[in-house]
Amino acid sequence: MKYKHIVFDIDGTLIDTEYAVINSLIKTITEITGRTPQYESLKFALGITGRNALELLKIPDIEDALKRWDRNMKLLQHTIQPFQGIKECLQSLLSRSYILGIVTSKTYQEYYSDFEPLGLADYFSTIVCADDTDEHKPQAAPLVAYLAKAHVSPENALYIGDSIYDIQCANNAGVDSGLVLWSNNVSNPIRADYYFKTPNDISKIL
């Protein structure tokens, strides 16, 4: 097989966090500024680090805002679930001797609070979170860190995500990319090496 490692983004790829992320951010901004932004205006925050999103929003006290956002996110934890078919997809890939990994813009704190309780963490051998690199998606650094940590060459890895940031990160790292189409974060055509309409397509195509 061409690839040894199949590396996944988390939000919008493995689990559906859009509602929780955007609504908790709306609540956070409202608490801080007194204004309530529109849902659609905050979709840019999906796929980048929380810190980067708040910086782009020109929130003055980032540390306070991150704490508020985390607290508001926990209130919506019950809305976060794996996408249908994800668990079966991961099981199928493991049964065919692929090594699974994660590269995410989440911090480790967010990873442990948002992702680990959903019962998917044990499928993955190597994890790279935002804490591991100074630069983040769409820069190459997160995937380069994964390749080093997992001792794998770029041509032996495939990175699967849902956003332009994921595909650009893969391109910048010299890694093939797969774009998932089951979440709603893609408004314009994005050029990727593979396109997956459902999680089952990953097992079919690879």
Regions found by a protein language model. Give the residues of each.
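N-terminal helical cap/lid subdomain that shapes the substrate entry/recognition surface
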Residues: 2-89, 96
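Conserved phosphate-coupling serine/threonine residues in phosphotransfer and NTP-handling enzymes
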Residues: 13, 104-106
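Short beta->alpha linker loops
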Residues: 20, 45, 81-85, 106, ...
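Asp-based, Mg2+/Mn2+-dependent phosphohydrolase catalytic module
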Residues: 1-6, 94, 107-108, 112-206
